[in-house]
Amino acid sequence: MSSSVSEECTPAKKKYDACFNDWYANKFLKGDLHNRDCDELFAEYKSCLLKALKTKKIDPLLEAARKED
């Protein structure tokens, strides 16, 4: 698994990736489409990413790109 955009978010990304991969292989492919085991880990990773994007001043670039669509 790759590192996160921000080094401080890599541990949260790795936890989420492991959870997602387990869910996908062991639940989703067996028909359990509504499992929410990884939601909390995703929220933690997303929060870290959003904070890092603001710190690195990347968030204005993302907003501008979204407006172009």
Swiss-Prot record:
Biological process per Gene Ontology, one example term: intermembrane lipid transfer
Domain CHCH: 6-56
Disulphide connectivity of cysteines: 9-48, 19-38
Cellular component terms per the entry's GO annotation: cytosol; mitochondrial intermembrane space; nucleus
Source taxon at top rank: Eukaryota
Keywords: Disulfide bond
InterPro entries found in the cross-reference section: MDM35_apoptosis (IPR007918)
One Pfam family linked to the record: UPF0203
Motif Cx9C motif 1: positions: 9-19
Sequence motif: Cx9C motif 2, positions: 38-48
Disulfide bond in keyword set: yes
Family: Belongs to the TRIAP1/MDM35 family.
The protein's name: Uncharacterized protein C119.18
